[in-house]
Curated annotation (Swiss-Prot):
InterPro entries membership: SAM-dependent_MTases_sf, UbiE/COQ5_MeTrFase, UbiE/COQ5_MeTrFase_CS
CDD domains per the UniProt record, alphabetical: AdoMet_MTases
Name under which the protein is recorded: Ubiquinone/menaquinone biosynthesis C-methyltransferase UbiE
Function, in words: Methyltransferase required for the conversion of demethylmenaquinol (DMKH2) to menaquinol (MKH2) and the conversion of 2-polyprenyl-6-methoxy-1,4-benzoquinol (DDMQH2) to 2-polyprenyl-3-methyl-6-methoxy-1,4-benzoquinol (DMQH2).
Highest rank taxon of the organism: Bacteria
Gene source species: Mesorhizobium japonicum (strain LMG 29417 / CECT 9101 / MAFF 303099) (Mesorhizobium loti (strain MAFF 303099))
SUPFAM superfamilies reported in the protein's UniProt record: S-adenosyl-L-methionine-dependent methyltransferases (SSF53335)
């Protein structure tokens, strides 16, 4: 779980994997990770989930159930490559408009290229900004989605408050994130795979294992399902619930602005 403390310089510190760093330093370090993996982001998620992330993302969009009518707007945060946004637009039969926000320009570049190739440029726009300081007016969006991104935010509580602010009354919050495995045997197997295999495979495939080591550590430091659900509730959301996937390797959290 991410816990903030005060640094010697007087600022707040937070978790960067298993390390303690200042909030500003974490953002810079995380940006560097995603600059390195932007062009191989799908491969990264395949390694982290043994390919299951594709099924989890499909399940996320199914639970969101975007309406098949014009004018419905979703904000997909930390969604630079467009993976979730494109699924949502497709599920709405081309009616939804998705704003993809990411703090990392390299990830957004990949997303813009993909949108153009898929013919979805008219249904999407890409914004480089911070999840803790969303550049949108109150009550702008019908839904807010974030997949495998919230654990990389230095101040998760601030990001959740911003999510609540930009949603319209009746709006939906959905967060897909790696979580705490709740099956004992699977827990040990996944831990061994994560800490031993993933960084080595990442280095072999991309030439740099450090980003993968951070991502594995960031999962271990993230709040478990119950604690994260409590954080969502504290941000103001109602009807908060979650669903586990693959024994808790991932969890999909839902909340409503009522």
């Amino acid at each position: 779980m991410s816990v903030e403390r005060t640094t010697a310089a007087g600022g707040m510190e937070t978790s960067y994997g298993f390390k303690r760093v200042g909030e500003g330093e974490k953002q810079s370090l995380v940006n560097d990770v995603f600059h390195k993996v932007a062009n191989r982001y799908d491969l990264m998620n395949d390694l982290m989930s043994a390919g299951l992330h594709r099924l989890w993302k499909d399940a996320m969009v199914t639970w969101l159930n975007p309406p098949k009518r014009p004018g419905w707007k979703v904000l997909d945060v930390a969604g630079g490559t467009g993976d979730i946004a494109f699924r949502i637009v497709d599920a709405s039969h081309g009616n939804a408009h998705a704003t993809v926000l990411d703090i990392n320009g390299s990830m957004l570049g990949v997303g813009r290229d993909r949108a153009q190739k898929k013919g979805l440029s008219g249904n999407t726009d890409f914004v480089e900004a911070n999840a803790e300081e969303l550049p949108f007016a109150d009550a702008t969006f019908d839904a807010y989605t974030i997949a495998f991104g919230i654990r990389n935010v230095p101040r998760i509580d601030v990001a959740l408050s911003e999510a609540f602010r930009v949603l319209k009354p009746g709006g939906r919050f959905l967060c897909l994130e790696f979580s705490e495995v709740e099956m004992p045997l699977l827990d040990k197997a996944y831990e061994a795979w994560s800490f031993n295999a993933i960084p080595k495979i990442g280095k072999m495939v991309t030439g740099d294992g450090e980003p993968y080591s951070y991502l594995v550590e960031s999962i271990a430091k993230f709040p478990n399902q119950q604690n994260f659900a409590a954080m969502i509730s504290r941000a103001g959301f109602d009807r908060v619930s979650f669903r586990n996937y693959s024994g808790g390797i991932a969890a999909l959290h839902s909340g409503w602005k009522l």
